[in-house]
Amino acid sequence: MTILNHTLGFPRVGLQRELKKAQESYWAGNSTQEELLTVGRELRARHWQQQKDAGVNLLPVGDFAWYDHVLTTSLMLGNVPARHQNKDGSVDLDTLFRLGRGRAPSGEPAAAAEMTKWFNTNYHYMVPEFVQGQQFKLTWTQLLDEVDEALALGHKVKPVLLGPVTYLWLGKVKGDPFDRLNLLQDILPVYRQVLAELAKRDIEWVQIDEPALALELPAEWLAAFKPAYDALQGQTKLLLTTYFDSIGQNLDTISALPVQGLHVDLVHGKDAITLLNSKVPADWLLSVGVINGRNVWRADLSSWFERLQPLVARRKRLWIGSSCSLLHSPIDLSVETRLDEEVKSWFAFALQKCSELALLSSALNNNDPASLEAWSAPIRSRKHSTRVHNAAVGQRLAAISPQDSLRKNRYPVRAKAQRQRFQLPAWPTTTIGSFPQTTEIRGLRLDFKQGRLDGTHYRTGIAEHIKQAIVEQERLGLDVLVHGEAERNDMVEYFGEHLDGFIFTQNGWVQSYGSRCVKPPVIIGDVSRPEAITVNWAKYAQSLTDKPVKGMLTGPVTILCWSFPREDVSRETIAKQIALALRDEVEDLEKAGIGIIQIDEPALREGLPLHQSDWGAYLEWAVDAFRLNAAVAQDDTQIHTHMCYCEFNDIMDSIAALDADVITIETSRSDMELLESFEEFEYPNEIGPGVYDIHSPNVPSVEWVEALLLKAAQRIPTERLWVNPDCGLKTRGWTETRQALANMVKAAQNLRQAQKA
């Protein structure tokens, strides 16, 4: 038996974020669609060749997306909401961009599709919309075109398709309610057509992704897999692909499916190799994900060699692969020229992970474990590194008591003290934190970072931008202000730069959604705060106005989830280390006179384990970390938190347990649907439902905002409602920001007047 290796997908954006730059240039009207298409072709060709050169046997095709792979699947199926359809019924690249962004260089602007997290990652997908009686047909042949590209270049390819059951699972019903699972029989003919086209191209294996199988699915959804895959049998072999967690709970169903292979994530899953050997049919190809696609740490290949021996001994066909798509990993470690060599030796980015697969498959095929020893040596040396361990942090963690996570009084007492202190009007208006990161701001930070600007001139420049943000907000009539975060490159990276235990890359970019990329810090050791982080800028901003200015912190769970974490200690331990560091920041902000402090936790739900049976333990420590961070605040200090793209109904107990005085949430894309959870739960504290979508450049009208607020007021008492955008305004321009906020403030003022009348 020859063991092949493969990846489940590769980063799309390019080492220098070429795709992002080409997208944004096209959207701004500065380049043509053909120029954008050329960049895409060049990136795909480069990435295929890089994987091949690294020793990957089978190259993924179909992992590239112009915005998001779920959105690509929607277009493939002809699933385009009426508001985005072209008059002639055609589907083109601008159709895709209108769905993702709400507008494109051609076609009429309309509300963008809802966006939410891809399982428990920091990647976002565009939620498919389903209506009763919907028709599907093959209207977007991107996958087939890209397979033709790769074949023309002489590559051995493995097309990648998002599976039909997972696709339906990820979507939402619009209009009259119905069971979207009933649409399965309608989308399967399109899948059959695509598979038939691939068979014509002599494709042997198709990777069909069904990550929903890593969930604890309702019985009717689990039962849907058998008829679905009965219908998809054909000339091509199907590699049913799962990832992000174990599938043991669904393995009996999976093993009865008419497929020829199965991919299992052994990194994040708890599936025992003995269970796989006994349950997965002997004649199936078994592919095991052994290289972590979601982190940056070098794999212990020597350990994997030993762990895989029972499979090598018993399986007729075995592949090794990445645990999931390498989409979630930076591209190339070799360009990181500023990393300390010891620390650098601990890491592997996407290209290095491809090399790891080649090394391990070669060692397995040649029964040569000695060939892996040099690769695994830095992993063992890291265990004893002084960069990793800080005794003082461990002592402080051990001294935590339950009282440390409790505010002095309950919300009703605190609310009274806060009303007396701030004297805010009904329908108080605020923003979520950041203001537009202009070319000038980015240039200022870059010049300072690269040594072209000294600290004094940098701070003077940042102070001017903060002053401008305060002036703009006062002119607009906002009630609670923010300093605008001009000094911050990223809400997680900024804090990581000021905390011990973090390191940073130069080019470690990963895609979050569309053209949005983030450069997560890496947590390499125990976390502590050497000095105050945000206090001076918050204090300066507050000195410019009589209105309250919020202190802005990123919460411990979000910093954890949006960083590449250590793997040698628990996530709970890391979160509580961060919480203790930020607790000191809350205390220092209070001492500086900051009376409203926002602790953002947009990633709280994202951190949930995929198995609902594991939620309780996670939520307990995640909530405790937030409270540990916030509970040092006095009664008249108002603690806000903000959450993104969340379904709240099944975690409302935990949301309430955070005990934040005000929670702001993203609701505009869901037309305030998310507030139903708060209404049914009778959420006791204050809520700011987002009234417009900041991810779209479309400016909401006063009437639009009023309508959403009135809809919110049907569910939440007006005395507990705040008025705010969905999220921070970092990615928007000042012109649209002014227009949108002016309309938002006017809507709040109109409602105040109506309330008095």
Curated annotation (Swiss-Prot):
Its EC number is 2.1.1.14. L-homocysteine binds at I432, G433, S434, E485, D600. It catalyses: 5-methyltetrahydropteroyltri-L-glutamate + L-homocysteine = tetrahydropteroyltri-L-glutamate + L-methionine. It comes from the Bacteria. L-methionine binds at I432, G433, S434, E485, D600. One of its GO terms (molecular function) is 5-methyltetrahydropteroyltriglutamate-homocysteine S-methyltransferase activity. Binds 1 zinc ion per subunit. 5-methyltetrahydropteroyltri-L-glutamate binds at R17, E18, L19, K20, K117, R516, C517, W562, E606. The keyword Methyltransferase applies. Zn(2+) binds at H642, C644, E666, C727. SUPFAM superfamilies: UROD/MetE-like. Keywords: Amino-acid biosynthesis, Metal-binding, Methionine biosynthesis, Methyltransferase, Repeat, Transferase, Zinc. Pathway: Amino-acid biosynthesis; L-methionine biosynthesis via de novo pathway; L-methionine from L-homocysteine (MetE route): step 1/1. CDD domains: CIMS_C_terminal_like, CIMS_N_terminal_like. It is an enzyme of class 2 (transferase). GO terms for biological process: methionine biosynthetic process; methylation. Pfam families: Meth_synt_1 (PF08267), Meth_synt_2 (PF01717). Its cofactor is Zn(2+). The active site is at H695 (proton donor). Belongs to the vitamin-B12 independent methionine synthase family. Catalyzes the transfer of a methyl group from 5-methyltetrahydrofolate to homocysteine resulting in methionine formation. HAMAP family: Meth_synth (MF_00172). This is 5-methyltetrahydropteroyltriglutamate--homocysteine methyltransferase.
